[in-house]
Structure formats: structure tokens, C-alpha cells
Amino acid sequence: MTNIRKSHPLTKIINSSFIDLPTPSSISSWWNFGSLLGICLAVQILTGLFLAMHYTADTSTAFNSVTHICRDVNYGWILRYMHANGASMFFICLYLHVGRGLYYGSYTYTETWNVGIMLLFAVMATAFMGYVLPWGQMSFWGATVITNLLSAIPYIGTNLVEWIWGGFSVDKATLTRFFAFHFILPFIISAMVMVHLLFLHETGSNNPTGIPSNMDMIPFHPYHTIKDILGLLLMLTALLVLVMFSPDLLGDPDNYIPANPLNTPPHIKPEWYFLFAYAILRSIPNKLGGVLALVLSILILAIIPLLHTSKQRSMMFRPISQCLFWLLVADMLTLTWIGGQPVEHPYIIIGQLASIMYFSIILIFMPLASLAENHLLKW
């Protein structure tokens, strides 16, 4: 009699995806972030579901309903802060996951990579709409500023913005629809994750060397499940420390002021995980140009497989590309810092230089460095 794990239609899907999955023996802890992202998504859906039971998507009561959750609902405060800081953890894991893909050449699995980019856009949209829901000052003005960017689209821009708002400004209709989208998108993301894994399991995992490892595979369970559990414990520890000791560390104090359309905050800025893109947006004086740069700052990931000029897949043995990669990381951190600063000298010029560097490294320097490294191989 065959093992039910391998014969039952449901369990054999789980078995081939998480138990008997052949996995390269050499993959490092950088490969933990996929499973951590899955855990983050599960935590966000669970905490979000319980928050939605007590939240009201109405401009007159939204702010008070969040206060009610924190004060009156049993363990409501932990739900709220797990959800808010869970989003930060989600993005930390996302950026590390994408960075791993860039460094080790995982983008050569183009289907997996492209589904991943769509997932990144979906998660960013979900997080943006979630930030609007508490209806604080930064929620309202963030929603106003970011949705208003669509008015830069020629001809249809103004109509498009008013259609999204459901009126002539961000108001009750906007909040209601943002709540609806914020609720449904994580389930769409879950379906996209399955497609992401489907494409990944067609090719198998990459490994740090970038060399095919078909002759050196081990089962996912128990070897990598144990490794993933360690990563999970470390992430949950970090999240719980953040939630218990300084839950507002990554938030904006302005969001504790109820939304007031008549009073603009001195510095409108999104959550920290969007600041790098916001800095790129602000560094271009033209509105349409800024919006294009904002979209391209993420969409540029889609053309990275086309820019791969190296004979080697991974950067493991490519020191020039490694230097450029870490320069790109430093540049993104600089952009994140600039995005949170006021629009004044010297921040404007630093932001513009960092934005030029961001696109130059990806589009020009990295492909050229790869070609140079190809020549060095011949020596």
C-alpha cells in the first residue's frame, strides 16, 4: 500500500511542494525569505480579519473605531500593532527577497520573476490602501497626494482621479472602496503566491553558485523546514519586540490626529517602505516625469533579465558586480532617508543624484561590469 501522503490528491500536492520537494543542498539563509513572506501574509490576513470585525469604514467613525479597537477590544492593541508592524516586516522580507534574486541571478527564471513583480505591486497597493483606513492626518493627505498623481496622465487624468475618489476629493466614498480593496487584495495575493510557487517548482530553486544543482538535491523536509523555522522564530521575535516595546517607532505621529481636510501637515510622506520611491518621485520637477520615474523605479525589475550580460548567473564570483550591487543597496537606503526629509537644500540635490545613480547602476553600470567580467574570464 502506498503512503497516503504520496497518493491522496490533496496531500500529494502538499507533499510535492513542501515535503519531498528536491532542494539544492547549498542554499543559504537568503532562501528563507520566501517562507517568511508566506508567514507574514498569513499573519496579516488573520490580524486584518479580526480588525475588520471592529472597524467601520466611514469618515465620521473610522478614527474612533481604531481607538475603540486599541482601548476596548480584548487584545485589540496587539492586533492593531501586529498588523501595522507586520506590514513593515512584510516589506523588509520583500526587499531582502528581491535583493537575493538580484544578487544570485534568480531573475533568469523569468515566469517566477515576473509573477513576483506583480506580487510586489499588489502588496504595495494593499499597504497604501491600508494606510488610509485609520483616517488620521497622514492617511488623508497621503491618499490625496498619491491618488492625485494620476491626474498627470494626459487627457484622462482628471477624470480618472475623480473616478477613483468617487467625488471631487478624498471622502467617504474613497474610504469605503479602499477598505473593500484592502480586504480583497490579500486573498488575490494568496492566489498569486500559488502561481509564483507553481512556476518556481517547474524549474526548481536556484542556489548561491548559480550552477545547476540537479545532482546535489536533498528533500525539503526536514532539512529546510528546520532552517525555515529558525528564520520564522527570529522574525517573530523581532516583530514581537517591536510591537511590545515601541509599536509606533515606524509610524507617523501625525496619524494620531484625526483627518482634517482644512489643515495640511507640514511634511506629507508615506510609510517608510515607500520612501525610496517617493524620493525618486520628488526629485523630478515635472509632475508626469515624476510619476513615470516612480512607476519605473519598480517596473525596472521586469527588464533585469534582459540586461543580464554575464556568462555567470550568480554574483558569487563577480567582484565588480558585487561592488555595484552593494552600491545600489546604499543608494536605496540614501533615497529612503531623503524621502523622509523636507524638500529643501541640500536634500533636493542629494535626492536627484541618488535617483540618477539608482537608474544608472541598473541600466548602465551593471551590464557593463558583467561584460568586463566576461573578458576577465579569458585571461
Curated annotation (Swiss-Prot):
SUPFAM superfamilies, per database record: a domain/subunit of cytochrome bc1 complex (Ubiquinol-cytochrome c reductase), Transmembrane di-heme cytochromes
Keyword annotations: Electron transport, Heme, Iron, Membrane, Metal-binding, Mitochondrion, Mitochondrion inner membrane, Respiratory chain, Transmembrane, Transmembrane helix, Transport, Ubiquinone
GO biological process, one term: mitochondrial electron transport, ubiquinol to cytochrome c
Record note on cofactor: Binds 2 heme b groups non-covalently.
Entry's Gene Ontology cellular component terms: mitochondrial inner membrane; respiratory chain complex III
Entries under InterPro entries matching the protein: Cyt_b/b6_C (IPR005798), Cyt_b/b6_C_sf (IPR036150), Cyt_b/b6_N (IPR005797), Cytb/b6-like_sf (IPR027387), Cytochrome_b (IPR030689), Cytochrome_b_C_euk/bac (IPR048260), Cytochrome_b_N_euk/bac (IPR048259), Di-haem_cyt_TM (IPR016174)
Top-level taxonomic group: Eukaryota
Main location: mitochondrion
UniProt GO molecular function: metal ion binding; ubiquinol-cytochrome-c reductase activity
Residues that hold heme b b562 according to the record: H83, H182
Topology term for the membrane: Multi-pass membrane protein
Subcellular location: Mitochondrion inner membrane
Residues reported to bind a ubiquinone: H201
Cofactor(s) the protein requires to work: heme b
Statement: the UniProt record of this protein carries the keyword Transport: yes
Classification via Pfam families: Cytochrom_B_C, Cytochrome_B
Residue ranges crossing the lipid bilayer per the database entry: 33-53, 77-98, 113-133, 178-198, 226-246, 288-308, 320-340, 347-367
This protein's record includes keyword Iron: yes
Family: Belongs to the cytochrome b family.
PANTHER family membership: CYTOCHROME B
Self-association and partners: The cytochrome bc1 complex contains 11 subunits: 3 respiratory subunits (MT-CYB, CYC1 and UQCRFS1), 2 core proteins (UQCRC1 and UQCRC2) and 6 low-molecular weight proteins (UQCRH/QCR6, UQCRB/QCR7, UQCRQ/QCR8, UQCR10/QCR9, UQCR11/QCR10 and a cleavage product of UQCRFS1). This cytochrome bc1 complex then forms a dimer.
Note from the entry: Heme 1 (or BL or b562) is low-potential and absorbs at about 562 nm, and heme 2 (or BH or b566) is high-potential and absorbs at about 566 nm.
Protein name in the entry: Cytochrome b
Native source species: Natalus jamaicensis
Gene from which the chain derives: MT-CYB
